[in-house]
């Protein structure tokens, strides 16, 4: 009997999300489940199946992504509400989001050889790839008969021109150590591009956008005729915009003035995962959390901020976003279908969108205040919030991005189901 579902896995630093999809030409959601709060216990478990929803604080100790994934599998395959729709026997494929794919330009089916190739990339992105690969390893052990496919955030940016992706350092060293701009959030940008092109009734290859994925990790991408021509993240996701705990772009020598132990291993390192003190400071002890004491941007993006530091954090993010929009607008020669806001903050923060668009009005962008405030409905993938009544205005969109769906959708394409 043919297998009939796809499992998409998205492992972050503090949460693991999984979604079961139908294995059909256009996948549809069967069930979703998530463990969050891994780094800030107690962890919580929640799921939804159709109209049924459940959320609970976990009594079990969950200290890692693999712990969370094991619990998710156990619950999904044993819970009375889930076991009838989330069966291991029905799984055709497991799709894994892996942040750094190095030189891989397309999804990779996991076998011994490809797994070890991905392990070699952990030195480039230990904070980002380690958890995902631990779950890939767990799937091979717990679900050995189900094929795992990895999808890379970096693959979307394979079209970056050499003058964009090359760092002006010794090129022999750069080639040997794979030191170049890669770019990330590519699975999200793929979804955004396809969804906005469909909304505009345009071919993807004729769609040009300035896309913003703004969440606890944030980036901007210039898309010309369906291809990434520049993006704010670089060798790792640390480059570019600040995030909840990331510094974003800084003077490269700053960290050596910050501490004289920058090159030493951080106490957060483990036997399997090596993190330098510099990496920990800039990835985990920076961003708007160190300015405000919170990673929750909804407490920062308010009309009456509780402190000057909250206002400063908001202004810093807006300033950096606006800088990239100006840069990319010029690179695209002004030929863009619009600016697209996506990601948890981009989709939810009307104040951020308002501030960014007000500061780019010289480029012709403007939003309708009511549409911007209302934002997208639950079932709306793309909404146009452009100011109405003006023919000269450039368009502004919100896209509710969905990386898990994008992996499932591309899984059906890579496995040829879309041609059946």
Curated annotation (Swiss-Prot):
Pathway(s) served: Metabolic intermediate biosynthesis; acetyl-CoA biosynthesis; acetyl-CoA from acetate: step 1/2
Required co-factors: Mg(2+)
Binding site for Mg(2+): 10, 403
Residues the record lists as binding ATP: 17, 213-217
One of the GO biological process terms: acetyl-CoA biosynthetic process
Top-level EC class: transferase
Top-level lineage group: Eukaryota
Active site annotation, chain numbering: 153 (proton donor/acceptor)
Entry's Gene Ontology molecular function annotations: acetate kinase activity; ATP binding; magnesium ion binding
Chemical reaction(s) catalysed: acetate + ATP = acetyl phosphate + ADP
Site (Transition state stabilizer): 185, 246
SUPFAM superfamilies (UniProt xref): Actin-like ATPase domain
Keyword annotations from UniProtKB, A to Z: ATP-binding, Kinase, Magnesium, Metal-binding, Nucleotide-binding, Transferase
Pfam families hit by this protein: Acetate_kinase
Ligand binding (substrate): 97
EC number assigned by the record: 2.7.2.1
Entries under PANTHER family matching the protein: ACETATE KINASE (PTHR21060), ACETATE KINASE-RELATED (PTHR21060:SF15)
Family, per entry: Belongs to the acetokinase family.
Alphabetized NCBIfam families for the sequence: ackA
Protein name (record): Probable acetate kinase
Natural source organism: Emericella nidulans (strain FGSC A4 / ATCC 38163 / CBS 112.46 / NRRL 194 / M139) (Aspergillus nidulans)
